[in-house]
Amino acid sequence: MTTVNTDLIIYDDLAQTAFLERRQDNLAIFNASSNGAILLDNELIEGDFRKRAFYKVGGSIESRDVNSTEKVTGKKIGAGEAVSVKAPWKYGPYETTEEAFKRRGRSVDEFSEVIGTDVADATLEGYVKYGLKALAAAIGANADMVVTADIETDGKKTLTRGLRKYGDKFNRVVLFVMHSATYFDIVDEAIANKIYEEAGVVVYGGQPGTLGKPVLVTDTMDADAILGLVAGAVTVTESQAPGFRSYDINDQENLAIGYRAEGVVNVDLLGYSWDTSKGDNPDLTKIGTAGNWKKHFTSNKSTAGVLIKLGSAAGE
């Protein structure tokens, strides 16, 4: 009798199912918790870059002389181009002998479930890292949107220094992103500078240290910097269907199976474009290189956010 598919465990489907279930949960939670500043999406995008043209007007009203018969000169509108870049990634390969699971009284298909869940978590963390590296690089290259501060001496002014860059539009900043050590330094400072204490009861002004704004705490962020981001600051799009591959390993002493995955994301920043002269298919280092991004919006208040450089490393 011939063996058919129903006689076997097909790991690709099981691993991908675990991946999709975990990814669905991760995306829903993350997009909401980032307050819309960091968006994770999926959409089929062709080519190495996504290029979109837009109009640049930036007009304003002027005084009009009701008694004048002078001619007026027409003004031109301009055009700009927004460019996002594709960044390829890989996961694994991971391999295990079937014996390693059988000796534990476990089904070998558990390997695919474990790996499928892990790749979903790994890609989420990786996508966030791509986005934050790109933001820090692009904003860091725009001197008008960079400030310096020291948490120990500036306290809450560390964050308001960044908000000042937006002037009357400061409420556009919807999220602060910082390393965990930086976050605890800010909270420690807020506790040390309490507003009122009586018989052990302490009253603090608003949320300690963060001006009532949510904070994304991630150790993928540099410890000596804080990002203040507006809504839609970065969109990381899974721009090709990710590939998953489970495979048999039959040329070793023990029967084994392996698993690997690969995919591509587009990194799209608000107000900044990838410089296509810097090449395509960048790795994380190139994504995080300031000279590889350029501002295409005229107004800084319309761009992704502000970068606060800390005078001393967090935790010191």
Residue ranges and their predicted role:
Residues 98-169, 282-315:
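Alpha-helical scaffold segments that mediate packing/assembly in large oligomeric complexes
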Residues 137-214:
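Extended, solvent-exposed, turn-rich assembly/linker loops in the middle of proteins
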